[in-house]
Amino acid sequence: MDAMQKFLEYASAYDDGSDTRIKLKIIHTQRVTEVMEQLTAARLLSEQDKKLAYLCAVYHDIGRFEQLKRYHTFLDYKSIDHAQLGCEILRQGDFLDELSAREREQVLTAIGNHNRLTIEDGLDEKTLLFAKLIRDADKCAIFRVFAQENPVDTTGFSAEQVGQEAVSDVVYESILGHYCIKKQERKTGLDVWVSFLSFFFDLNFAESLRIVLKQGYYKKRFLELNFEDPATEERVRRCIAETEQYAYARLRMEELQ
């Protein structure tokens, strides 16, 4: 059975049709695998390495379904680290049985690192590559979720609430300084939304930047938002402009190398 078929079979056991968030995660996983195939096609990888990267994509969010069942939320800070839960599920099941012990650990370690602020130190070169690939593929696909799905489900905050809030100084300065934003630094719902823009600064591959810029999902929510405070709207637009300038500058540097 193909890995995606096995994943869909596993996910279907949680889907009784009453919670649309199950479908959301299935679609997200399919999008991540599509992006992963684009990223691996742009690199000189062996067929086996492409397969391992694909498995990282298919199974990276497998912990989401049990998370939702137990805690009724996808928000890790209100429940459990879904990546670590997913690794437990993968270890207990037969999802990776066809792999060697070393390959299993490479895939599991990459999945365990996909939602961290930064990748853990000390990984071997191959595992580090898989971790970078799944982090990029996930972020590229998350922008679509952010733009198109119910923001209360995906971020915990509605557009109405966010439009009345401000961007905290630390979040604003992090975007201008090209830093990833720590969860504890976010003080408002708008901070949570703006923190998605900081994904740009953690993308590892030029192809990832091209995908995100072409999609345009990263700015869609903000362009549709009704801001109560014009100064806040200006701050958000500055954040968007800064991330775009950063991305295009990196791509120009890549072309020169």
Which residues fall in each region the model found?
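Short low-complexity stretches enriched in small and charged residues
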Residues: 8-14, 64-68, 93-98, 149-156
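Alpha-helical scaffolds flanking conserved acidic
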Residues: 46-59, 101-110, 127-133
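A broad, low-specificity signal for short, low-complexity segments enriched in glycine/proline
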Residues: 15-17, 104, 156-162
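Short coil/turn linker and secondary-structure boundary residues
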Residues: 2, 45, 99-102, 231
